[in-house]
Amino acid sequence: MKILVIRLSSIGDVILTTPVLKQLKEKYPDAAVDFLVMKNFKDSIEGVPYIDNLIFFDKKENDGYQNMVAFGKKLAENKYDYVFDLHSKIRSKIISKQIKLSGAKVLVYPKRKWWKSLLVKMKLIKYHVDDTIVKNYFKPFKKLGLKYRGEQLLFTFSPKDLEKVKEYEGLFVRAPGASKETKKWTKKGFGNLAKKLYEKYNIKTVLIGGREDIERCDHINKISGGVCINLAGKLSLKESGALLSLAKLMVTNDSGPFHIGRGVGCRTYVIFGPTDPDMFEYDEKSRLIYKGEKCSPCSLHGNRECPKGHLNCMNKLSEDIILKEIEKDMENNN
């Protein structure tokens, strides 16, 4: 049996496919499982042992309707029995359609009803997910007898990645970036938290993120009184995962590092504001920090600006709330 799983982006959403892939390979060990992902997100899934062949979608070469049709026809030559489209957007639909013409069965994961999204945009209802992302990923796999068993994520890295970050073992980590401005907790909050943790535990905080987060992390370090180490823009995704595997704990916004941290077993505190925390499940190693304002959640992916202009879900969240959670866990685990 030949199977193609499609999830083109982004970091977290790709990592969230790993529980499905694991169970798929366990139930059908002889099946050939291919995975299609955008080239710029390959580090999110590369090295996962449940995949036989990783296929890259290169936007420079494959984007545009005609190119996507040609790309789909090329994939159809692999003679897949099943295609599981876990992206369910225009690119994956065009590609899947071409493979379907070759005789493959195409199954798509359920997206949110369009009219619910419209009502949220019109500010007539609050945003609420119908189910967790991982549970939704499992739904099209019922055809093959797969059943949801939890969010055991996996993120991999190499010994070389681990060696590069070995010197930061046992430190706290913060990931203050996010794809949208409204999903970012305050710089003051991150800075004050790092300062208070250093005063109590004499442990520094490593700041991680992309190049776009360098200035933000510099500002956070100044607020902390210089007790942070700014590695934003200096680590690859795999190196960030290796760092988190060695970290004492991480505090992050609702962004990719949350799922990387869970995928390497790092104790993680995730801050939610405008987005719905019910997209995921939590356990003793993944803690939810959520103020729960009356107007929250208000969007699926966050916005550039708060629809109400105050962003109270983030601005009113005190570092002391997170500090108390960390102190409690530090006491219980020492």
What are these regions (language model features)?
Residues 1-334:
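Catalytic machinery of carbohydrate-active enzymes
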